[in-house]
Amino acid sequence: MSSTTMESSGLKKSSGLKVVFFGTPEFAAHILEYLIANGENIVAAVTIPDKPQGRGLKLRPSAVKLVALSHNIPVLEPTKLRDSDFIEALAKLDADCFCVVAYRILPRDVYTLPKIGAFNIHASILPKYRGAAPINWAIIRGETESGITTFLLEDKVDTGNVLLKESVPIRPNETAGELHDALMHLGAKLGHETLLGLSLGNLAPKKQLDTAATTAPKIFPADCIIDFSKPAIEVHNFIRGLSPHPGAITTLHNGAKVKLLRS
């Protein structure tokens, strides 16, 4: 990837840690590619099993799996994270650190395996927007900034002690897709900086302020219907917050459903 090569020029030093990378979608795959380009020792990638997609329902690998295989990195695809064979395979890797991006909730038996610990790269400034869809909800709720937080894993989702964070502005007409891409690049940089900091032992984990926490739950089709009775700015934020995926939906007079991506 040319973008990865360009981004890598500012950070050439690797942490020297043995890292297992957990992730699935493009957001995670870009970060994995960046870490590899910066010399990180990714000893394995963990992702979801291949899923049937398209008209022919052919099995398609995840974006993370494709990147890992292109670099000859072993791939683990557990269906159950508490499976004893999977946990044994992870333990044999003798990893220093787990890096988790847009993956499933890891049980304690898994995230406590590495010597240094396991950290997540989350697309919000925690404790705001804990949950599965932080990018969408930040825009829907009219926030003027977002960012990336890296934090140590704990049993409860997105509650662990913060390692690093960096914010970016959200432009008035910016869509979720555009913010996704901006945070994907920032997440790669901050993920690498987190690995460097962990290897040097110079990060000071900071407890999150739970009283300031907000949530960003998963978005379902029923959540995507536009309510035109709301103020224009709220409708505008709703449309761009769901653009391009899953898309804000309205119904025409003839019953046809239409996705609106801009307003």
Can you say where each PLM-predicted feature lies in the sequence?
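Internal anion-binding site segments
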Residues: 3, 210-263
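Donor/substrate-binding cores of folate-linked one-carbon enzymes
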Residues: 38-41, 48, 97-215, 222
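Amphipathic, non-transmembrane alpha-helical secondary structure
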Residues: 29, 33-37, 87-91, 108, ...
